[in-house]
Amino acid sequence: RPQDNFYRYSNGGWIRKNPLKPAYSRFGTFDILQDTATSQIRHIVEELIAKPQTKGTNDYRVAVLYKQSLDSAERNRQGYKPLIPELQALQGIQTKDDLLKHIAQQDQVYGQGCLFGTGVAADEKNSTMNIFLFTQTSLGLGSRDYYVESTPEVKQILAGYEAYLVRILKLSGYSDAEASRIAKATIRIETELAQFSYSNTELRDSQKNYNIVTIADFARDNKGFDWSGYLRLRGLDVATANFMQLNFFKAF
């Protein structure tokens, strides 16, 4: 009945006739575009690997990467060994300076934002120029709600996340005690970050996410993190930036 569930009343027939495939949580125009693009890229890559490539060329690199990605037997043989240098680097962090250097290195070498993200985009109030951006981090569970809400369902999800972290850490060579300690510390840090993260509603507010500040002024007023030092370690000459989720960065 429309008074019970108007969405089902108006769309129910179409939904029943067009059930979602098990791999999809939704399926629309953009999903069709993505599937088409993925299929086309796969066709291009499979043509590459079917013939010899000259070592050092981009075609060669693509072919090698694709073959390595499919070689699950070799990945299983190596286990977590390729990650050992990264794990050792994390274990070597003792001071704020160590942490600063590690974050800058991860961003610069791998493009992997730690604690926060960075990028460049068009200035929303001056489309003739681009501007450097600082953005809040993506938490392990995605939404901040999983960390700040206290419903039974959320608590169950958080407990499952902790169990998952423990399992991954144990597979990476950590003892049961160490795995449990690191997993709890990870959730504690992510929960603290979530306290200052913008909600999904706030992230859609373009005005609230437009906070142009000079690096010098922001660094002077927010000394919990060496913002100027971070940019210097990355070799970036940035005078002004958009700290999109301003309260998140002030919390540092």
Give the residues covered by each predicted segment.
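Active-site-surrounding "flap" and adjacent substrate/cofactor-binding loops of secreted or lumenal enzymes
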Residues: P2-D4, Y9-E74
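Short intrinsically disordered, low-complexity coil segments enriched in acidic
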Residues: R1-P2, A251
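Noncatalytic, helix-rich "gating/capping" subdomain that lines the substrate-entry/channel surface
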Residues: E47-F252
